[in-house]
């Protein structure tokens, strides 16, 4: 899908730097102004069924595995045409910094983004269901039991990033025990990147640093 927004406002601002007071000066401006933003996203998914049949004479007659993989893509352009700069001069006059701002900062509908982003999302949802021979010998139908109500994995790849492009893999799941009287949920975050000696994430895969494929960062 593609989204386009036209934003109109009658209140904008101008920013300058006062060297005497060494402070930012914000001047409100009245009058019609506008900016436009747009983005694009798309996704596709499917459902895959797997059946393992053990025979009607077995206690567990069959197990069905349902997988729902999906992939998505999002892109948000940088609208830096709506940004300006002002100079901040140090007290000794030796250094000058450029500060970016947009005149739409105080707009009722927010301001246009300045950072380009592009990412691919991956997810996989699973559930496992078993057909079990009923203890009641008079029953004609097998009993259906969920072994796993859900087992989900998701991650993102930052196409626009210059490092640490993969986000951590988020794992979540749940099942029910004791004839659906007890619900059990679990989750974990698995990071593909290694840590340095200061426990700071670095742009090196954990497996290339002598570790496992993923590093458990939370559970």
Predicted regions and their residues:
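Outer-membrane beta-barrel translocator/pore domains, especially the C-terminal barrels
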Residues: 1-219
